[in-house]
Swiss-Prot record:
InterPro entries documented for this protein: Ribosomal_bL28/bL31-like_sf, Ribosomal_bL31, Ribosomal_bL31_B, Ribosomal_bL31_sf
One of the Pfam families matching this protein, by short name: Ribosomal_L31
Name of the protein this chain belongs to: Large ribosomal subunit protein bL31B
A GO cellular-component term linked to this record: ribonucleoprotein complex
Keyword terms, alphabetized: Ribonucleoprotein, Ribosomal protein
Encoding gene (name): rpmE2
Organism in which the protein naturally occurs: Pseudomonas syringae pv. syringae (strain B728a)
Entry keyword annotation includes Lipid biosynthesis: no
């Protein structure tokens, strides 16, 4: 293997700005920013918009209103579909 071609693997401080959560993770990400962690050590710093601490899939706070809206729209659109056939059958008898 060629020397000095691989990125440096190190501990990096990731900050989820939406949930204000910090994660120390081993990574090869290239960043010039550093920040001091609560343990007193200064680590390379990367800000994240979304992580497992703030993503609705992982937090269990999924937006069910969108799904309920789709179901309500479907039921509203096809509400008369099944009832029209029943009325015609009842009127024919």
């Amino acid at each position: 293997m060629k020397p000095d071609i691989h990125p440096q693997y190190r501990t990096v401080l990731f900050h989820d700005t939406a949930a204000d959560a910090y994660f120390l993770i081993g990574s090869t990400v290239d960043t010039d920013r550093t920040q001091q962690h609560t343990d007193g050590t200064t680590y390379p710093y990367v800000a994240l918009d979304v992580s497992s601490a703030s993503h609705p899939m992982y937090t269990g706070q999924q937006r069910k209103a969108t799904t309920e809206g789709r179901i309500a729209g479907f039921n509203k659109r096809f509400a008369t579909f099944g009832s029209a056939g029943k009325k015609e059958t009842a009127a024919a008898q």
